Amino acid sequence: MIHPDPTLFGHDPWWLILAKAVGVFVFLVLTVLAAILIERKVLGRMQMRFGPNRVGPKGLLQSLADGIKLALKEGITPAGVDKPVYLLAPVISVIPAFLAFAVIPMGGEVSVFGHRTALQLTDLAVAVLYILAVTSVGVYGIVLAGWASGSTYPLLGGLRSSAQVVSYEIAMALSFATVFLYAGTMSTSGIVAAQTSTWYVFLLLPSFLVYVTSMVGETNRAPFDLPEAEGELVGGFHTEYSSLKFAMFMLAEYVNMTTVSALATTMFLGGWHAPWPISLWEGANSGWWPLLWFTAKVWVFLFVYIWLRGTLPRLRYDQFMAIGWKMLIPVSLAWIMIVATAHSLRTTGHGGWASGLLIAGTVLTFGLAVVLWRTMRFRADRTVPARTAADVFPIPPIPGRAGAARTPESRETTDA
């Protein structure tokens, strides 16, 4: 197992840096094309239909055909839009999606034409904070798209998206705090190296579950796709977009899905380390093999996205915000205090007490989550009290019928 030497970053020749940047871009684009096709195929199987099956063998070229179609369609700019902002919004949305992947480690140290390099474009001492900052910029594109469209539905979708990102970005950042405590670094390659013996999904299970919930809300995917809810907002923030501009929004959505899936792999599933029992093979974590393990883990999370979309209904807006503010954030804060205490005990030589505290803390955290969830369910299931006749707005008398203003109850009695 060869972990990248931190001194390698920034010393690659220019052609190797360019090759790695192009490689990351191609990896993301191919993943998006495959994810769209597989999503449609899997949803088709879930709904007892075939899915795409006309373009290419078994429909394998459907995503490519859709991309070409969108690129060649006529671009229509509605009247009344703020044109410069309207055209700039898709670009602001898609560029941060690609930039965030620059610090994701996709493998260990390899040799390319005699040059030792890491399968990672670059790394920073605060790489995870860089990812959080860059992904937060993408929401500006959504908000500006809603504002510049000059329509009510896109504006509501943009405002929903901004509130959604603010709410779930806090929970996502809190889930990372425990990882920073255990790894002792915010560098992505350092966090992967710290998981050589044990993945953090086993040590920090509550943090992992909070992150998985937050990443679905962060990327505006079902059942948290409120900014583009078709039944409420037609198409949400991209209602007024078509052709290549609409394709850029869709590209940004799927690239963001890939990025947060890769971040989950890096933070909790050991990054590019081979899973057990493959890790028993001596060469599993050397050479180009780690790229395969990394890609497989990313696809596990992408399948979770597809699975959730095909099985869960969309939440109401108040339910969605309540989950973020009333459950995820309080649970994360309680779990951080438990992990910080356990980490202090471990560093002072009380490993047994630390392990027991983590186990008890996990149980207590799940108990707190259940209590908060039941409280929210009780508030959501409250019945509306029956209204008396005095509370009902009176119905004006109908022409041709005698009598004063009637309530619905009196009308039913009279009609009967």
Swiss-Prot record:
The chain crosses the membrane at residues 16-36, 84-104, 124-144, 165-185, 197-217, 260-280, 288-308, 320-340, 353-373. One of its GO terms (biological process) is aerobic respiration. PROSITE patterns: COMPLEX1_ND1_1, COMPLEX1_ND1_2. The keyword Magnesium does not apply. Keywords: Cell membrane, Membrane, NAD, Quinone, Translocase, Transmembrane, Transmembrane helix. It catalyses: a quinone + NADH + 5 H(+)(in) = a quinol + NAD(+) + 4 H(+)(out). GO terms for molecular function: NADH dehydrogenase activity; oxidoreductase activity, acting on NAD(P)H, quinone or similar compound as acceptor; quinone binding. It is a multi-pass membrane protein. One of its GO terms (cellular component) is plasma membrane. It is found in: Cell membrane. Its EC number is 7.1.1.-. InterPro entries: NADH_UbQ_OxRdtase_su1/FPO, NADH_UbQ_OxRdtase_su1_CS. NCBIfam families: PRK06076.1-2, PRK06076.1-4. Belongs to the complex I subunit 1 family. NDH-1 shuttles electrons from NADH, via FMN and iron-sulfur (Fe-S) centers, to quinones in the respiratory chain. The immediate electron acceptor for the enzyme in this species is believed to be menaquinone. Couples the redox reaction to proton translocation (for every two electrons transferred, four hydrogen ions are translocated across the cytoplasmic membrane), and thus conserves the redox energy in a proton gradient. This subunit may bind ubiquinone. NDH-1 is composed of 14 different subunits. Subunits NuoA, H, J, K, L, M, N constitute the membrane sector of the complex. This is NADH-quinone oxidoreductase subunit H. The gene is nuoH.
